[in-house]
Amino acid sequence: NASALNIAANITTADGLIDINAPVTLTGDAVITSGTGGGNVDFSSTISGGQNLDILSGTGNVIITGDIGGTALTSLDINKTGAGNTGSIFLSGNIGTDSAAGEGAVNLGHDGLTLSITFGSTGVAGDYNTTGDQIYEADSYVLSGTDPTFATVDDAVTFNDGGLTLATASNLTINTGSGTAGAITIQGDIAGTSDGSTTTVTLEAGSGAVAIKGIGTDIGNVTIDGGGVTLNGSITTAGGNIDINDATTLATGAITLTTANG
């Protein structure tokens, strides 16, 4: 195994494993492709460098254990295109830090992705900080890290299709800054873990729009700030308040807001 690895060009296998165990610096744009079969793409260390990285894994999984963006990437796309790229995505590390962006735009998954995207590791704080839009598309999302925070500066954060499941310590924060372009869209339900503890949900969109489905299952406080809020489902807390701080549109019929004390 190398102590460090520079990548400046594409890497392609015919359905074979791509296993990179050294810290990676991108010195050129790169497309990492493991074919249409079950070849996993596994980065066991960090990824940095001001370039574009595109990963396509077929039916194999994409596993990135280390942090991304010590030097911010220009963009990160994982299984963004191609009907055959349906493998799950596991990001154990962070994208950037709580104070510095780790990349420009991020696009994980696409409409044909039938599996899941998992963020974080148990006991480790989760930060996903970018200077561009964050677009995620999968049938389900698992947030495993401590207090995952998705942050942009006036850019959108979108979770398409599936619902979000929050682990016991995964208090969710999405903060898109103070401008109008930082919309927050979550098409699936947000749910905690049924273990008797509660997790909080904080959505801060500045003047941007917020559109969410339902929130429930061991959820604590729910706070939503934005330039207009659209509810496509009900919100239920098991031990906290519901605080919505802007004009709200009920997009469907019977929507209820229920706290633990009624």
What are these regions (language model features)?
Residues 1-262:
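Extracellular lectin-like interaction modules
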